[in-house]
Structure formats: structure tokens, C-alpha cells
From Swiss-Prot:
Family stated for the protein in its record: Belongs to the universal ribosomal protein uL14 family.
Tree of life domain: Bacteria
Protein's name in the database: Large ribosomal subunit protein uL14
Organism: Verminephrobacter eiseniae (strain EF01-2)
SUPFAM superfamilies: Ribosomal protein L14
Regions crossing the membrane: none
Gene: rplN
């Protein structure tokens, strides 16, 4: 569960290392985001020669949460931390590589590119 002011690590090669959630998109009163949800983030920590700079605002999709995801068969998929992948205005990933596993819940029409780039899909 990601909410406003949550810190996330970045799971792609855009150069951003850490981002801060500034808004959960999808309704005026929406408070929490889970895996597959789109959020607005501010880059808080970035590599020196990366594609993104500190302080820039981007959309991002949540790919891993420490809270976990309940599946239909009753299983629960949890991760050690929260992670997101940065998106451009067309909701396409900015980076060309994805680090770490992603969940099957991302396999929608919007995020098939992220699933295909990921080294492991749980």
C-alpha cells in the first residue's frame, strides 16, 4: 500500500534511485495505491548522468509492495520493499531495463512492455 509521502525505490535504468509519491491517481479521495496502480512521483535521489534529474515530476506504476497482493487462490505475494517504474506522458516506461521481479498483475494491455522487460514475473 503506497500513499502520499511514501518513498519507493526505482526498478529501472532511468538514473533515478529513490522517488517520493506525491499523488495517487484515480479519484479525488483515493488514498492508497497497490501493484499496477499509477502514481505521481518526485525524484528524490538520482545518478549523476542519468536520464532523469532530482526534483523532476513523473508518473510511475507500482511494481512491488511490501504489503503484498492477495491472489484469487488465496496466496499472498510480498516483497522486501516498495518499487516503481517511471513512465512518460503516454504511460510508456522511460527506461529500457527493469530490475528485480514484477507480479503477474501487471499483465494488462497498458503494462505488457514492463512485463516483457522484467527478468522474472511472479
Amino acid at each position: 500500500m503506497i500513499q502520499t509521502e511514501s518513498r519507493l525505490e526505482v526498478a529501472d535504468n532511468t538514473g533515478a534511485k529513490s522517488v517520493l509519491c506525491i499523488k495517487v491517481l484515480g479519484g479525488s479521495k483515493r488514498r492508497y495505491a497497490s501493484v499496477g496502480d499509477i502514481i505521481k512521483v518526485s525524484v528524490k535521489e538520482a545518478a549523476p548522468r542519468g536520464r532523469v534529474k532530482k526534483g523532476e515530476i513523473y508518473s510511475a506504476v507500482v511494481v512491488r509492495t511490501a504489503k503484498g497482493i492477495r491472489r484469487g487462490d488465496g496466496s499472498l505475494v510480498k516483497f522486501d520493499g516498495n518499487a516503481a517504474v517511471l513512465l512518460n506522458a503516454k504511460l510508456e516506461p522511460i527506461g529500457t531495463r527493469i530490475f528485480g521481479p514484477v507480479t503477474r498483475e501487471l499483465r494488462t494491455e497498458k503494462f505488457m512492455k514492463i512485463v516483457s522487460l522484467a527478468p522474472e514475473v511472479l
